[in-house]
């Protein structure tokens, strides 16, 4: 979208832009699809994931994938961008925003971060009504500190509002003009792969618990 990364719309025959997009959190549902859409828009993609998912993201088209838990991940990605021009970054997952700030602060090109998620405080999500006010205060503090860090590094950002796709040109271009043919000819694949837990409403709680524990490169599914 124009007020985010402003990438061209995806096509079946993209013109190479000569630029590289950083997708932090590539093994998530958002990340897997972002990688493919960016490539279809003419961009090279560098991503992050746990080592077990590196080969999967490369099959989706990422040229390089780094371990987000590595203590040298920021320096490693900056090094990978040494002879590249950044198209910006998409931050997905806890801690991703500040890491992306550090990376883009050391790169040439578009220093803009499209935020798909906000950082959850270390205390986790509120478990009851009394936990909600301090939770929101911690979230606000995290967001403000992130904005300050962005400014110091010459980086700008904006939180993504998914509902915007319903009222602008991007939603139609992707869901009506691009995806039907791309899915049919295999240039875009549904990702991540589904992990079916079982059938029936009685399996929903099990699926929720599994999702809460954390999954990567999988989409938890309950059939009805």
Residue map of PLM features:
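Terminal helix/beta-alpha structural elements that buttress the NAD(P)+-binding lobe
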Residues: 1-224
